[in-house]
Regions:
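Helix-boundary/low-complexity linker signature
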Residues: 15, 24, 33-36, 43, ...
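Membrane-interface segments at or immediately adjacent to transmembrane helices
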Residues: 181-246, 250-252
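Membrane-proximal helix-loop-helix units in multi-pass membrane proteins
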Residues: 82-126
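Juxtamembrane "helix-exit" motif on the non-cytosolic side of transmembrane helices
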Residues: 26-33, 58-59, 82-90, 114-117, ...
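Conserved, well-structured beta-alpha core segment at the onset of a catalytic domain
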Residues: 94, 106, 113, 125-129, ...
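Glycine-rich catalytic cores of cysteine/serine-nucleophile enzymes that process amide/ester linkages
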Residues: 229-326
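Activation targets extended, charge/polar-rich intrinsically disordered C-terminal tails
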Residues: 17, 36-39, 43-51, 56, ...
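Membrane-anchoring hydrophobic segments
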Residues: 1-83
Length: 427
């Protein structure tokens, strides 16, 4: 008999998928009518809410009772703006502006990625330039005040919601299916926008902290859970911390056969573009010492996801690790004291890794990982290039994955009875 949490996750995926598909079809068919109707429904909700507060105020405790003039003010404002064409147009333009801004954002990411690939003579790279041109073109066209691009952008949004809904429906309908993927082929998955999934690691941490504050006597139960008795062959760590914005977005690395493999911009002397670009550095470290360093140095919380692999998947991952090994050049971090981002003068983080976590560090002789870029050739892409050999889903056709996107996928896999993820731990 399936667990309640599994049943909930299954029907949640189906419900979200159906909702996204229906909304997508409505946007494709009716265009601007849908957001305008949504605006009116929102104003109608505010009006009814104000009326309800007005009718029930005499039954409420005086301390919780809203000031009658505030309630009347809400009612009057909602009634006045309910059918305001100007405000409807403003809300519609704001929606289009957000979509166009996201297109410009992803277009710039593609352009920077293409530029780095070109500098490092990486092929293929033309698709990144193509993505940059059409995404920036769409964004500039839609954000221009000289014409109305609302229907065009809503059409694109509708098709995006159809694909997003299809991914959710597939998750729901095949939730309990035992995967049979002998060729370890990867399936395409449509995910939420980067600016949404970027908040998942810190959001998960805050939920954990809230849970712990209410269950102090059972704190140990949160730190480790297993779905079944299958062995854990590979771990994926998702880090997050509330100490800075970049740490809040998270970091991803993997642990295979007791060794942590991580990738990032660990050479501060090579950093540029506000620290977003730098030489790509890979390190291998002792698992236990690395976890302790992360908790001590940056006050990080690590969410560890354990994957159970078949012999075929292990062989594919080991082959990929061997490919990466051929690209590595040993690198020694400087022992010189430097001013860190936190403002402290101390050894670089890469030097601490070497001294405190028994890490060996490397740079890349070639490949897309020669230069690190926080929004494309980042820690998640390196981890995914390894774990993906086990047949996990492709989370971005463009290769832009943030830690939150990966964590969302791993959490979903854990809820599936036959999913790849068999354990979750928190450090």
């Amino acid at each position: 008999m399936p667990k309640l949490s599994e049943t909930y996750s299954k029907w949640k995926s189906i419900g979200e998928g159906l909702l996204a598909i229906v909304l997508g079809l409505l946007l494709i068919r009716f265009g601007q009518v849908i957001p305008r109707m949504g605006y009116q429904l929102l104003m109608g909700y505010f009006s009814l809410s104000a009326v309800w507060h007005l009718l029930t105020r005499w039954f409420q405790d005086k301390k919780r009772r809203e000031n009658i003039f505030v309630t009347l003010g809400k009612l009057v404002v909602a009634a006045l703006v309910f059918d305001s064409i100007i405000l409807q147009d403003l809300a519609l333009y704001l929606l289009v502006f957000i979509i166009a801004s996201y297109q410009l954002f992803t277009g710039i990411i593609s352009l920077v990625t293409w530029s780095l690939y070109r500098k490092n003579a990486i092929h293929p790279r033309l698709h990144h330039l193509f993505d940059a041109v059409w995404m920036i073109g769409f964004g500039l066209y839609s954000i221009s005040p000289f014409h109305d691009a609302a229907n065009f952008e809503l059409l694109l949004l509708g098709f995006y919601l159809l694909m997003l809904g299809a991914s959710s429906l597939r998750d729901g309908f095949f939730f309990e299916r035992i995967e049979n993927n002998p060729k370890l082929k990867r399936r395409m998955r449509m995910t939420l926008p980067i600016f949404v999934t970027a908040l998942i690691p810190i959001s998960t941490l805050r939920k954990l902290n809230e849970w712990l504050s209410n269950h102090e006597s059972q704190e140990g139960e949160v730190h480790s859970e297993r779905k079944n008795d299958q062995t854990v062959d590979l771990e994926i760590f998702v880090h997050t911390s509330e100490t800075s914005f970049f740490l809040a977005m998270g970091h991803v690395d993997i642990c295979y056969q007791g060794t942590v493999i991580s990738y990032g911009s660990y050479d501060p002397r090579s950093e540029r573009l506000f620290g977003m670009v730098g030489d790509g550095v890979l390190f291998k470290a002792n698992r236990e010492k690395y976890i302790e360093l992360c908790k001590r140095e940056s006050q990080k919380t690590l969410f560890a996801y354990g994957l159970s692999l078949t012999e075929q998947q292990k062989a594919a991952i080991q082959a990929r690790l061997a490919e990466i090994e051929d690209l590595l050049i040993p690198w020694e971090p400087s022992s010189q004291l430097m001013k860190r981002r936190e403002g402290e003068v101390k050894h670089t983080y890469s030097y601490q890794l070497k001294e405190e976590a028994d890490a060996t560090l490397y740079k890349f002789s070639s490949s897309e990982f020669k230069t690190y870029f926080v929004l494309s050739t980042n820690c998640v892409l390196l981890a995914d290039s390894i774990v993906g050999k086990a047949g996990t889903d492709i989370l971005s056709p463009q290769g832009f994955i943030v830690p939150g996107t990966y964590q969302d996928y791993l959490d979903l896999e854990y809820t599936k009875p036959n999913g790849l993820v068999v354990s979750r731990s928190i450090y």
